[in-house]
Regions:
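S-adenosyl-L-methionine-dependent methyltransferase catalytic core, i.e., the SAM/SAH-binding region
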Residues: 1-87, 99-334
Length: 334
């Protein structure tokens, strides 16, 4: 989940980018808060193109184990190349899931951890993990530029493409199906709740009147006509931004998956283990903040390490506009 839909027209992603322009967000801050222990076991719950994972792996060393999860099989293919860049690396496939176990055997980087790449949602982070077995969890939530930059994936309103929006192309429900089958009230509620769009009813009415809608460009045109910007804040972003965010969150169950991850984290973390979450819009950040606070105050299993969210420096924001809306929060298992 979520590239920021209020500040960045196309959104931002989890350490994402095209294969050629892979710039992880808040990289130093995330690695510092994760406090990687040599020889430990760590989970990158949103491995993306492997940017954060690579830095974790360098610190783990040969005794360590890094587990990388992602819904997107294309991202996993690229992450494999990023994490195993030399010809001497070895890859073993584990049928029928397509999950990959990677291990270094080249001479240059013999001090390299075992790396397991799993095609699964971070909601399933606890699957296969015993209680108190993990030293750290990193989750960089959101849609990646790999997904945004491919018109065929249907995430961006800036290019003509099918209304797909599935992070996992193998999942069943597309944005087109949702958009053309919800009634007007249900659609308005989705746009308001997941897009925080105040003009949700007006937009939903226009969508229903224009159905069937099959493409990103058609949907963007319908929204633009129904919700023209009236003030400077609205003019700062494309009128379709929040609606596209809402549909993407619904199709991919992003907030439910985030809640599942945060519920599982204290069970699988060792004492002293840390969970670090980077989010990109207020819905996600609120869920993380509340889960960490409740874990500290009510259940006593967390110590919150970030009383306020950590944000990118001006230098990083200038260098990487996707970082402008990123917020990092961290907690330690006690």
């Amino acid at each position: 989940m979520g590239g920021d839909s209020t500040d960045t027209p196309q959104g931002v992603g989890h350490g994402g980018g095209t294969e050629a322009s892979h710039v992880p967000v808040l990289l130093k801050e995330a690695i510092d808060f994760l406090n990687v222990r040599r020889g430990g076991t760590y989970i990158d719950a949103t491995v993306g193109l492997g940017g954060h994972s690579y830095e974790i792996a360098k610190r783990l060393g040969a005794p360590g184990h890094l587990i990388g999860l992602d819904k997107d099989p294309k991202a996993l293919e690229i992450a494999e190349k990023q994490l195993m860049p030399t010809a001497g690396s070895s890859t073993a496939l584990s049928p029928p899931t397509g999950d990959k176990m990677l291990g270094r055997n080249d001479k240059e980087l013999t001090d390299w951890p075992t790396i397991t790449l799993l095609h699964r949602s971070f909601a399933d982070i606890a699957n296969g993990q015993g209680p108190a077995t993990i030293d750290g969890i990193l989750a960089d939530i959101g849609v990646s530029n790999l997904q945004l930059s491919d018109p065929a994936r249907g995430f961006s309103f800036q290019a003509e493409g099918p209304l797909d929006m599935r992070m996992d192309p193998q999942s069943e429900r597309t944005a087109e199906q949702v958009l053309n089958h919800l009634d007007e009230r249900e659609l308005a509620d989705v746009i308001y709740e997941f897009g925080e769009e105040r003009r949700s009813r007006r937009i939903a009415r226009a969508i229903v009147r224009s159905r069937p809608i099959r493409s990103t460009a058609h949907l963007a045109d319908v929204i633009s006509a129904a919700a023209r910007p009236m003030n400077s804040e609205q003019r700062r972003i494309h009128p379709a931004t929040r609606t596209f965010q809402a549909l993407r969150i619904l199709v991919n169950r992003e907030l439910d998956d985030l809640k599942a991850l945060l519920e599982a984290a204290p069970r699988i973390l060792k004492p002293g283990g840390r969970v670090v979450v980077i989010s990109f819009h207020s819905l996600e950040d609120r869920i993380v903040k509340d889960a960490f606070r409740e874990g500290e105050k009510k259940y006593k299993y967390f110590r919150v390490l970030t009383k306020k969210p950590v944000t990118a420096s001006e230098e990083e924001q200038d260098r990487n506009p996707r970082a402008r809306s990123a917020k990092l929060r961290a907690a330690e298992k006690v």
